[in-house]
Amino acid sequence: IKLDIRDENNVAAAMAQAAEHFGGIDILINNASAISLTGTEDTPMKRFDLMMDVNTRGTFACTQAALPYLKKADNPHVLMLSPPLNMHAKWFKNHTAYTMAKYGMSMCVLGFAEEFKPLGIAVNSLWPRTVIGTAALAMFSGLVKVENCRTPDIVAEAACALLVKDSKGCTGNFFSDEELLREKGIHDFDKYAVDSTKPLQVDLFLD
């Protein structure tokens, strides 16, 4: 599906297309993000708008458009790939705009979880304990090397573990990938490391 989540009409059409193809929508994963780890003077308003439009507004738009379909699902889940709301100033000072945009997604978790609770729709957050080796590493300006990361597999498996939970009994949580996998009895995470001989880089927003 071709989708620009900044365009609410495009989003609505994509949801309708997905629902028609699959016979409904059981799960919405809000993963699309724009990132720029830049200070105030180095963040053009165009870049600020992009991060807000994709991260916060896009999450709201996709959830709003998916809601009619999620209401009909047997075990509906909305999952945000967003961090816990860590209000320590150090997570704002070097990239206030990005933190605002990303925390907007996390604020949606809090609001949607309470709003949709009577509907039985779960809304939770998932955030990796370590930096994940994806194309987004380029935005870290060389501060993080891929060998100090884990692979996306750990996030995918954690998401699967979460999305099979009873939606009526698990909502409004901010989970880490390690936490969800430990619940499944997985305690050895070396297999997820890009290079298990190298130290891992803890992800943003985690102390």
Question: PLM ranges: what are they?
Answer:
Residues 24, 106-110, 116-128, 168-175:
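Conserved Rossmann-fold SDR core element
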Residues 71-72, 76-118, 130-131:
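Catalytic loop of short-chain dehydrogenase/reductase
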Residues 63-64, 110:
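A short, exposed helix-loop element centered on a Lys and neighboring polar residues
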Residues 2-13, 45:
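The beta1-alpha1 cofactor-binding region of Rossmann-like NAD(H)/NADP(H)-dependent oxidoreductases
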Residues 39-49:
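Substrate-binding pocket helix/loop in short-chain dehydrogenase/reductase
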Residues 125-126, 144-207:
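C-terminal helical subdomain
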Residues 30-33, 76-83, 122-127, 171:
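Structural signature of the Rossmann-like NAD(P)-dependent dehydrogenase/reductase core
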